[in-house]
């Protein structure tokens, strides 16, 4: 895979004006030539969000769960080109190779240190993946380039206006008949008052200024603003594939059983679209 960096890329304000997650240097600060430090810090600093949930074979994460869900829900869908926006260090890009081994993977992010780290991880793991330093609001790919566009925990880091621009770009680069699947935190209208308080704590105390504004919006409205029709749009909630009984996971994927309530390594909330052919 190729690593393509753009040293002239302007950092968006929602990245450059604060240390998101209170992580010193955020994602993009560079301290030396070829620096990967912020990627490594993110890889380990992100563990704080697990709390006591240490990595294990029964916790697979977003991409493993989404790709498995896609393979069950849409068995004829075989994406040849997959794009992840806001890929950081590749955690939620690599697992798509397990389900779609022939797919070409591409990840974009504004942060060069994270992309260098992601590329090094891909090489070490033997995963063929391309990484490109781009702002997802203005992708340089041609129209109708990808079969599948994904993201994980991405949009709540952006302003709502930036989110709308990214979704419009996702639509532009998506092939007719292609699919877009974004995993995000649930809208405030879909959870109870305590869970809203629990999630909104980050908005006040963890340098997450766009968190509450994003969650106050309905995903259907955001999608409509990007040009997706109601017929194209969908939402879903799926269990984490690592911790779920395979038969139960399959039932949820097929709409034959209710998913568990939202929670890290319990259930993942999705929204997306199938672009009209």
Positions of PLM-derived features:
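Core SAM-dependent methyltransferase catalytic element
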Residues: 226-277
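A short acidic, Gly/Pro-enriched loop at the edge of an enzyme's catalytic core
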Residues: 137-149
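Nucleotide donor/acceptor-binding cores
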Residues: 79-81
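Class I SAM-dependent methyltransferase SAM/SAH-binding core
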Residues: 83, 89-138
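A short glycine-rich, Lys/Arg-flanked "PGG" loop and its adjoining helix->strand segment in the class I
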Residues: 164-176
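C-terminal alpha-helical "lid/dimerization" subdomain adjacent to the S-adenosyl-L-methionine
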Residues: 181-245
């Amino acid at each position: 895979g190729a690593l393509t960096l753009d040293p002239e890329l302007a950092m968006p304000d929602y990245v450059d004006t604060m240390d998101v997650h209170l992580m010193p240097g955020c994602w993009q600060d560079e301290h030396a030539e070829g620096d990967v430090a912020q990627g490594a810090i993110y890889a380990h600093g992100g563990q704080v969000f697990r709390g006591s949930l240490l990595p294990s074979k029964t916790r697979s994460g977003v991409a493993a769960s989404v790709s498995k869900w896609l393979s069950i829900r849409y068995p004829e869908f075989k994406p040849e080109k997959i794009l992840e926006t806001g890929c950081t260090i590749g955690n939620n890009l690599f697992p798509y190779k397990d389900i779609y081994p022939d797919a070409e993977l591409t990840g974009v992010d504004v942060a060069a240190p994270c992309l260098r780290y992601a590329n090094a991880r891909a090489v070490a793991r033997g995963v063929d993946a391309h990484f490109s330093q781009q702002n997802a609001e203005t992708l340089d790919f041609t129209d109708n380039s990808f079969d599948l566009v994904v993201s994980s925990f991405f949009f709540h880091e952006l302003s709502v206006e930036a989110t709308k621009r990214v979704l419009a770009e996702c639509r532009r680069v998506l092939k007719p008949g292609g699919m877009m699947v974004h995993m995000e935190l649930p809208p405030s209208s879909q959870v109870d008052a305590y869970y809203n308080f629990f999630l909104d704590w980050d908005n006040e105390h963890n340098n997450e200024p766009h968190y509450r504004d994003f969650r106050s919006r309905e995903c259907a409205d955001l999608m409509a603003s990007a040009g997706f029709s109601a017929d194209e749009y969908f939402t879903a909630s799926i269990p984490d594939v690592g911790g779920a009984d395979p038969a139960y996971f399959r039932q949820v994927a097929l709409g034959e059983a209710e998913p568990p309530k939202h929670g890290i390594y319990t259930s993942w909330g999705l929204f997306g679209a199938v672009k009209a052919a």
